[in-house]
């Protein structure tokens, strides 16, 4: 098992981990990631799946849980269908939504103090831009046998670890690393 303690999530750490995984003889059929933009470039030679759960969470943060605009409510409903759609159906529905709301999304508001304009519905435009960026990676799991569409299983394994770290937030770095090492040692002896 590859294990490295990092204080920040960096692309170079992912590159190092992937190189180690391949060096010890594993073949990487595909990678599920949760949205770090630079990883798409780093893993360009691999089949990459954007975690559908994280995609929905990104859009939900931009729209809020209860969008007040009809365009936002429609986009929220479209995102709710993501995990049960295939690439063609979801893409067609998204493009139809974008065409329907195109002029609305281009509306601009004038700042009365400066006279400059900005997009009126910035958060909705941002949600749309995120979907456009990640769309090529949302259905890779259908092309790779056994690849999941989310990283929820892996996230679930780490729930206990995160809870323990949060419950002991005053731990020194060395103690935190010892806790993490013990977690992975136990996990390695009892794989899930």
Which residues does each PLM region occupy?
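Inter-helix linker motif
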Residues: 45-67
């Amino acid at each position: 098992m590859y294990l490295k303690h990092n204080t920040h999530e960096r692309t170079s750490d992912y590159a190092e981990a992937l190189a180690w995984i391949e060096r010890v003889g594993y073949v990487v059929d595909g990678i599920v990631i949760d949205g770090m933009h630079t990883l798409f470039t780093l893993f360009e030679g691999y089949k990459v799946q954007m975690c559908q759960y994280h995609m929905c969470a990104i859009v939900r943060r931009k729209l809020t849980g209860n969008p007040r605009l009809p365009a936002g409510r429609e986009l929220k409903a479209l995102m709710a269908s993501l995990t049960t759609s295939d690439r063609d159906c979801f893409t067609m529905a998204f493009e139809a939504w974008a065409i329907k709301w195109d002029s609305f999304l281009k509306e601009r508001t004038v700042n009365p103090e400066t006279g400059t304009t900005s997009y009126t519905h910035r958060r909705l435009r941002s949600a749309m831009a995120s979907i456009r960026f990640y769309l090529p990676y949302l259905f890779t799991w259908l092309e790779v046998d056994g690849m999941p569409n989310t990283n929820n299983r892996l996230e679930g394994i780490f729930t206990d670890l995160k809870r323990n770290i949060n419950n002991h937030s005053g731990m020194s770095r060395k103690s935190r690393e010892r806790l993490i090492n013990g977690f992975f040692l136990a996990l390695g002896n009892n794989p899930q």
